Amino acid sequence: MSDEAKQAIEHFLHGQVECWNNGDKEGFFEHYRSMTRSGLSIEFVGRPLPTDSWEILEGMWAQQQPRCRIEVRETIINGEEAACYHYNAMRDGNGGIETIELYRFDGGRLWVRYFIKN
């Protein structure tokens, strides 16, 4: 993988979190659009497969962005794949939710798998 490709992945991973935490919806979605010329697939592991990944992102933004802030605990990038360990801290201070997020970038397509600790 080229340095340019790795930098694009790093920019996406860190940028989307920054936009989420700052309430910048347009910036958040622009980060996703920049990496998904050929499509986007989002899966919540252990739940039924979604039908429209963009609707999933819209729903996440509407339901979760006002309630939680993302704290990045770890980000590992290997080739065209990344694993992120996040703590989604409740903005009201009442706990949070741990997630492991897997990203695969391939030819303008992005696959995302969310593992959510209940």
Identify the function of each model-found stretch.
Residues 4-24:
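Short, aromatic-enriched amphipathic alpha-helices that serve as compact interaction elements
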Residues 16, 28-32, 40, 57, ...:
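Hydrophobic pocket/interface hotspot
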Residues 96-118:
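Short beta-strand edge/turn micro-motifs at domain boundaries
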Residues 65, 90-97:
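Short, cysteine-centered beta-strand-loop-beta hairpins and adjacent loop/turn segments enriched
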Residues 79-85:
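Short, hydrophobic/aromatic-rich segments at coil-to-beta transitions
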Residues 44, 86-87, 114:
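Residue-level recognition of conserved beta-strand positions in structured domain cores
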Residues 6, 25-79:
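A solvent-exposed, acidic/Ser-Thr-rich amphipathic alpha-helical stretch
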Residues 70-76, 87-89, 98-104:
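Hydrophobic/aromatic beta-strand elements that line small-molecule binding cavities or substrate pockets
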